[in-house]
Amino acid sequence: MVAARLAWRTEADGVGGINAERLVFLDECGVLTTLSRLHGRSPRGTRACASAPFGHWTRVTVLGALGAAGIVGAMSVEAATSAPVFHAYLDAVLLPELRRTRPDAVLVMDNLPAHRASRVRALLDASGFAYRYLPAYSPDLNPIEPGWAKVKAELRRGAARTVDALHTACGPALTAITAQDAAGFFRHCGYSRPN
């Protein structure tokens, strides 16, 4: 595993011919209709009170991609990430957006089985985009991970309690990731932008 991480670092630092500006990291996160803030404030001497839902909840999966300038394309679905779901995301959302805005992008994914499915690889090969897989167990090398933390904080703030409200809230939560945030996430994960 150490050798795989070192090889990835060497390739991603430009030695292997990949400029950090070209990297687009793909990942997914699950959000629930029960998301609520973890901390609260109230006037001194009073207890902070808020309702926090328990019991029935619904999961929504958000698939997204992050480039050095921000979110490139995202989609939310009421399903776990499977090969058909990921294929649909690539085909309908991400690849058309990248063709329009970032034709030289290099897609980077973790090792989720849906990312390695033969139909997904066939689609990526046919698209003409280069793609790479992160070394196993390396979320620290994926800048979209801290991005998901910011998205979930925004969703907690909005407290969407229905699936429709959660889908609607995902858009503004994703746009909360600014270009400055994205650049910081890239730096945090060790990717430097060229001068």
Q: Locations of the language-model features?
A:
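Short functional hotspots at interaction and active-site rims
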Residues: 1-195
